[in-house]
């Protein structure tokens, strides 16, 4: 199938709107991606004609809704090549998935004197839960430092492991720098030390295929809303043997086998024991539509288009005076920058006046900002629906801001 950005853009209604009298150039998909009509329509159709509470319902609508939900679990397992659909837990997003692991597996397996390894480039969602766990149990948090070019100092990683290292929690792709970490060698090294590995895949799954069996990671988590799906839904993958050993984190309906006031409660099997309460079934249906949409386009086709667009963007941005770029030359999805001494918020506001949407701030990565000694950065992210013309508008906008502000 030949990739056509014009055909893709036609599927996204919001891309036809104007902002400040100019066509919208949406360069903020790393924060949250726009949704194609196929996703919007699938969720709306479910609410119009198929909604019911899932699980245990004997009536037709409930049975059909349950089947649709479980079919999405199967589709998601194929999307990341999990061995079984029962290795996937529906969560609200990447943040909840990481917190689930920290509060279930972490509480059961990390003790005083143990340690967990993260990196200096992590999103707060892959820092704070581990800080909280370490504070609860008296464990140590160790950090892989950054290089100035936005890659990790991987030569330090072997020195961080010891017999007390329980987990390596690492991002697949940096949400600020676009750095893709060499997971295969990092996971192999961790497993040689008997250490489990959690991968934050929030910024990876939309850009190229992910194969969790080939990676051999123990946990992999991602959000639907960055993958052109709805908000409030994501996937946590856990190797089946590991998942079956983990205790539930939240209690309530749907996650129990039996409840007795005198004899206590027993749990249902995984993954359902981690899905307490009424799920976001509409969001799950929308996620399924997003997975189907992206799979039909072909992730390899998407990857090729996006990489060509990224190379073009980086080359064109060289013409902007006083522009500082952060991150390696080879990157996925995002371009973080600052313009001269001007605050990122000011630059972002000017770009918005030109109809260009970028993200400004610390990007939930304050340790990374501290490393580069800046309070904030601008971030333009490139998705499968962005165009060379939008890149040109970004470059022209930055050149204009430089002329105006000096």
UniProtKB/Swiss-Prot annotation:
BP GO terms, sorted: cysteine metabolic process
EC number: 2.8.1.7, 4.4.1.16
Sorted UniProt keywords: Cytoplasm, Lyase, Pyridoxal phosphate, Transferase
Cofactors: pyridoxal 5'-phosphate
GO molecular function, one term: cysteine desulfurase activity
Record-linked InterPro entries: Aminotrans_V_dom (IPR000192), Aminotrans_V_PyrdxlP_BS (IPR020578), Cys_dSase_SufS (IPR010970), PyrdxlP-dep_Trfase (IPR015424), PyrdxlP-dep_Trfase_major (IPR015421), PyrdxlP-dep_Trfase_small (IPR015422)
GO CC terms in record: cytoplasm
Gene3D superfamilies cross-referenced by the UniProt entry: Aspartate Aminotransferase, domain 1, Type I PLP-dependent aspartate aminotransferase-like (Major domain)
Function: Cysteine desulfurases mobilize the sulfur from L-cysteine to yield L-alanine, an essential step in sulfur metabolism for biosynthesis of a variety of sulfur-containing biomolecules. Component of the suf operon, which is activated and required under specific conditions such as oxidative stress and iron limitation. Acts as a potent selenocysteine lyase in vitro, that mobilizes selenium from L-selenocysteine. Selenocysteine lyase activity is however unsure in vivo.
Recorded family membership: Belongs to the class-V pyridoxal-phosphate-dependent aminotransferase family. Csd subfamily.
Record text on subunit structure and interactions: Homodimer. Interacts with SufE and the SufBCD complex composed of SufB, SufC and SufD. The interaction with SufE is required to mediate the direct transfer of the sulfur atom from the S-sulfanylcysteine.
Protein name as it appears in the record: Cysteine desulfurase
Organism: Escherichia coli O17:K52:H18 (strain UMN026 / ExPEC)
Gene: sufS
């Amino acid at each position: 199938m030949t990739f056509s950005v014009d055909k893709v853009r036609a599927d996204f209604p919001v891309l036809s709107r104007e902002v400040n009298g100019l066509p919208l150039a949406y360069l903020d998909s790393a924060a949250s991606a726009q949704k194609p009509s196929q996703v919007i329509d699938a969720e709306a159709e479910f609410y119009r004609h198929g909604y019911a509470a899932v699980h245990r319902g004997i009536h037709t609508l409930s049975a059909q809704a349950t089947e649709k939900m479980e079919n999405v679990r199967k589709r998601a397992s194929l999307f990341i090549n999990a061995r079984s659909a029962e290795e996937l837990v529906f969560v609200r997003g990447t943040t909840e998935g990481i917190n689930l692991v920290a509060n279930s597996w972490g509480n059961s397996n990390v003790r005083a004197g143990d340690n967990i390894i993260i990196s200096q480039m992590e999103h707060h969602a892959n820092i704070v839960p581990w800080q909280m766990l370490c504070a609860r149990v008296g464990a140590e948090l160790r950090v892989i430092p950054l290089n100035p070019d936005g890659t990790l100092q991987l030569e330090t990683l072997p020195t961080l492991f010891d017999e007390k290292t329980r987990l390596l929690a690492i991002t697949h792709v940096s949400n600020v720098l676009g750095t893709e970490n060499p997971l295969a060698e990092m996971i192999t090294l961790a497993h040689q030390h008997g250490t489990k590995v959690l991968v934050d895949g929030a910024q990876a799954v939309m850009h190229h295929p992910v194969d969790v069996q080939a990676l051999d990671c123990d946990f992999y988590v991602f959000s639907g809303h960055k993958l052109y799906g709805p908000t409030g839904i994501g996937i946590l993958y856990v190797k089946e043997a590991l998942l079956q050993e983990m205790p539930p984190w939240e209690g309530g309906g749907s996650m129990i086998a039996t409840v007795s006031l005198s004899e206590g409660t027993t749990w249902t099997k995984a993954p359902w024991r981690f899905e307490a309460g009424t799920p976001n079934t509409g969001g799950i249906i929308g996620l399924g539509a997003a997975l189907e949409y992206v799979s039909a386009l072909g992730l390899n086709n998407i990857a090729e288009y996006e990489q060509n667009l990224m190379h073009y963007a980086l080359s064109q941005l060289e013409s902007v005076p006083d522009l500082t770029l952060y991150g390696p030359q080879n990157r996925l999805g995002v371009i973080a920058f600052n313009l001269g001494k001007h605050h990122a918020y000011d630059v972002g506001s000017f770009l918005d006046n030109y109809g260009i949407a970028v993200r400004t701030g610390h990007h939930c990565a304050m340790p990374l900002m501290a490393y580069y000694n800046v309070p904030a950065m601008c971030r333009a992210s490139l998705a499968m629906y962005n165009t060379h013309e939008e890149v040109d508008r970004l470059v022209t906008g930055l050149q204009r801001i430089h002329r105006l502000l000096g």
